[in-house]
Structure formats: C-alpha cells, structure tokens
C-alpha cells in the first residue's frame, strides 16, 4: 500500500474552507453570547476575503500562466481546485446569510434593530434625510460609464453601487457608479424613542434611498450594490534589489489594483444588464460571482460590536482577567528573577505584561548593553516599539529584525522600521526569499561585572493586543545554552556565514524538519521495543507532506498520535491500515488557538518543544523559525495538563473522520470546554482534571459552575 496516495490526503484549500465553516459554526452556536455570534460573522467574512486575495489569487495566477501541474497531495490541478473552492464557498456563503438572518432576528428581540428606509418612523426619516444632505452627499462622487468615460479602476474590497439610468424624456439610458465612502461609518445610529433600544441603518441603504439626487434629469431604474475582491498575492522579486524597503513600498501600491477574482452582488437588487457589464469588465466567470441574500461585506460586524455591542454586556463574553505567572513578582526586577529560574507564560491566561515590562526595564536599565529582537506583527500603538526606541535613544545597542513581508502588515512594518532607524536602532530585514517568523528576544546585561544574557522565546507575536485573544506559549530564561544559541542566531541573521550548530534550539529552513522527522522515527523505534510510543502535537495547520507520511508510518507501527490542529489539516485520520491510530481535533472558541506545542513520549522522557512554526511546508522550508525545548519538569507537567484539557474538550472541539469531514466531539457525562477550564487551572481553581495518558476517560469532575470561579472585569452596561 502506498501511504502517499492522493486518497489519504485532504486538499489544503478545501481543508481551509472547512476551518472557516467551523468559524461559521460559532455563529449558530446558541451557547455563545448573541453579540459574539454576530462578531463571528465578521470573522468568517474577513477570513474569506484574505483567502480569496491570497490563495485563490495565487491559483488564478497559475491558471493564467498556463501552469497545470497538480498539487502534491490530492493531485488536483489549479483549475480543479478553483472549481471545488467555488462550489464549497457558495454553500458556505448561503449558510452565512441564513445565520445573519437568525442572529439579526435575535438581536431585534433584544432591542437592537437593523432597519431599511421604508421601516423608519417620521423622526428617523427626517434624521436620515438631514444626515444624507449634510454628511453623505458632499463626499459622494457619481461616475458615469460611457464611451468617453471608461469603467474606473475600483479598489479591492470597496463597496460600490451600480446604477441604471434613464433620461426623464426617455431619450437615452446610461450606466453610472457610486462608491460607498469608506471614510464614513458603515452604519448610521438612529434616534429612538426608547433609550433601552438601538436602531441602525446601513450607509448603502441611505445612499440608495436618495440616489436620485445625484442624477438630475434622470430616473434611477436600478441600484445594485456590489464589491470586487482583487488578487493580493503579489510576489516580491528580491533578487538583485539594493533596497528591500523601497521595493516593497512600490509593490504594495499595486495590491489595491490587482486582477479581479471575486464579485459580490446583492441578490435582491440584481440587474442583469449591470451584472453582465461588471462580469465583462472584470473578465470573471459565473463561478466567480456570489449573489448574497443580505448586506454585502459583513466585516462591519467588528465596528458594530465595538461601538454598540459592548453596551450590552449580557450579550458579550465577560472579560477574563489574565494573571501573573506564579512566583513572578511585579515589585522585583525581572532580570533578578529570571536568573533564579525559567518562567513559562501561557497567554492570554497569563498576562502579556511581563514581556512588555522586560523590554521597558531593559530600555531604562543602565547595565543593559544590548537588545536584539525579531518583530513580525505588533499592535497599532506598540509599547514594544516605544521601549526599543527609548533603548536606542538611551545609547544601547538595539538590533531589530523587522519582517517587511508579513502579509497585510507590510506598510505598518515599513513605518516601524523607519521609526526605529530614526531613533538609532540597527534595523535589518532578514534573508532574501525567506520570511523571518521567529519570535525571540536577546538582552545582554552587565551583571556584577560579567556579561549575562536573557532570552525570551515564544510561539506568538510581540503584539500586546492579540496576546489578549490568541493562545500562545512564551519562555523567559537565562540558561547559557539557549543564550549562546540566541547570540549565534542574531549574528547569523545580521551578518554572513552558514547557520551555526545549535546547543538547544533548532531552526528552519535548515534543521527543524529533520529534527521533527527524527523525533517521530525515534518514537517508532521506542514503540517497537517498549510498546509505549505516543505523540501529541498542537498547531494551527498541518500541510508538510514529509511529516504527514512519517506520521502515517508511525501510526502503522502502532504509535498513538493525537493532533490538535485548529485550521488546515491535509492529514486524514482513522483510515484502516494507514492512520487508524491518529486522532485529529480542532478547537474553535473565544480565543484563537495559536500555540505550537509538540510532545514525544520518548520512552518516558517526555520531550516537549514549542515553536513559532506549524507543521506547514512554508514554515519548514520557506521561513526562518525557531523550535525550543521546555526542560523544567513542573512546566512540562503544566503543558501536559493543558494538552489533556484540550484533548478532552467536548464542547468546542470538532473531530475529523476518515473522509476528511468534521463533527462535534460526542458529549460524555460532563461538559469540558477547554479554554474555560485551562483558565481555571492556570488560576489554581480547577478541582480536578483529565489525565494526560487517557484524556477521554471522564473519571474527573471539574467545578460545577466554572464561569463563576473566574475573575471578571466589570463593565458598564446599557441593559
């Protein structure tokens, strides 16, 4: 039997759509607070936008270039993948708008209404009329489309209205476009009689209601909202360039104007002539057109949530207060504490504050000589950037690798790079054709007359905002072997020369893949000898074929394998004779599962590694990543307990079957929602937990009312 046959794999693109389907499942999950369900509609839409701009855009490029080679797992050609994507996406979008109707109906029952113009009362009608005249009309620009004024280049993801016009005397018909201004809020908060209620109208509905005023002497026969998504998969041709920053700045300007790859139209406003015109101008096929049964672009759910939803605290998640890691005292200098022991941080259950505090203390400590750090994505008002600038201004040697090719953060990172350079930091951009995705900080300090190095390693970005929403692992250490590796790592990044030999770390694209394959091979050998082989791996996505085939070999040898893969999973479990010893689950909940953790039983030695890398082809072969060990037994036990809770999840976990489909995990006698229970466990408030050896055996009883045991942050409420 060939274990690398196409029938034993899932296609990457379809697997991603299945992940987004699980996100959509959070909209329909009535256990979630209502406004959170509405927000998940925005997450689904935002995810799909990026998928089309990057993945579908890349496949379209391959088709246009005449590239017809099948991908290396299911052996589907680019054209076959595009057809499969369109079929699955149309199915999901239909489900999304059914969910939108259900959620908005439920919001209406809570006193939150989305109104059409013909549903407004007299007071609201007058308000909207004035609002349009004073705030909307001045910024609108009607654009005629005819022989002298060709179809304009509309930017990607902009919302527009196509209009069919007829002269009042009936002498001629014309076409025109009106862009819905992105500078105005997408929804208008309306006056209401009852202060306990909220009513809004969407901006495009306001414009359509008064669109006649833009075309004097014409009747508007039809007004059809539409939205174009353009290819944003722009390759940066780095070879031969002398200034990567300027190259990327130049290429970014093209992103808004890439080839059209998707057209969204509003189903209840379709005009055949307008639709045909758009299809021809954009050179799209029927499968690229999505008629939606509701407002186009539900990403406005984010703004609605932050501006209106938060006023209804019974409709949103209660804020969980993160805790300081045990034994880490805020009153003491971090350097002194890290010298005494390693500290493991598990965000967002542990606060991200110690990481910020470390950089701030280093920036202002006269004994700190140098700070070196990699940055991939940071927050909009980053305290990390501020501290690094302060350090440079204080005369310290500051070296920062800013990854300019971080997708959709390129412009922000260019600005950060300029600011850091202006402050006196040495800014580098990494290696040609490789993204630096590693998360590492090295601080060099004069400690009692000798050089002492401090290191932070993590699975997630140095982003204080996403650290509240993403689960990640971080390690603070002063261990000499890791410190030496960190020094060599930064010297390799900033200088020339081959990658050094490592003491404790492993990196891609050089040694990490080989390390993982070796660890799996060792587990096979131990199982054949002792019968106790086991692998537990948690990650965002799994696409690397060499690792998948090696896991199949381990499964056939009898090794017990549990994979927690939130997103794409090209491995297919539970296939007799191939992967029957592999279980794959995915947890989608309030926090985005982002940590990468790898456990190998190793005949009782319990090897645990964390990494910035997933088991993906791009991470193993096209990015600079770091794999680091967890050595402390107490920290290893904590990670094993968290993995056990995640494997035992029967509320938010879905399990993949042998056909590649996902289903909710079967409920047992008691519910286990892993994120809630991990918070309790981290806070020291969980009375019992599942065993790591047998997490599915329900012989433990957690607290009965978990949510009451967590410390919540009080919020003001409208209701």
Curated annotation (Swiss-Prot):
Record-listed E.C. numbers: 2.7.4.1
Keywords on record: ATP-binding, Kinase, Magnesium, Metal-binding, Nucleotide-binding, Phosphoprotein, Transferase
Catalyses which reaction(s): [phosphate](n) + ATP = [phosphate](n+1) + ADP
Sequence positions that bind Mg(2+): 377, 407
Active-site residues, Swiss-Prot/TrEMBL: 437 (phosphohistidine intermediate)
InterPro entries listed in its UniProt record: PP_kinase, PP_kinase_C_1, PP_kinase_middle, PP_kinase_middle_dom_sf, PPK_C_dom2, PPK_N_dom, PPK_N_dom_sf
Record's GO cellular component terms: polyphosphate kinase complex
Biological process, per Gene Ontology: polyphosphate biosynthetic process
UniProt key word Kinase: yes
Protein role: Catalyzes the reversible transfer of the terminal phosphate of ATP to form a long-chain polyphosphate (polyP).
Sequence similarity: Belongs to the polyphosphate kinase 1 (PPK1) family.
Name recorded for this polypeptide: Polyphosphate kinase
Species in which this protein is naturally found: Exiguobacterium sibiricum (strain DSM 17290 / CCUG 55495 / CIP 109462 / JCM 13490 / 255-15)
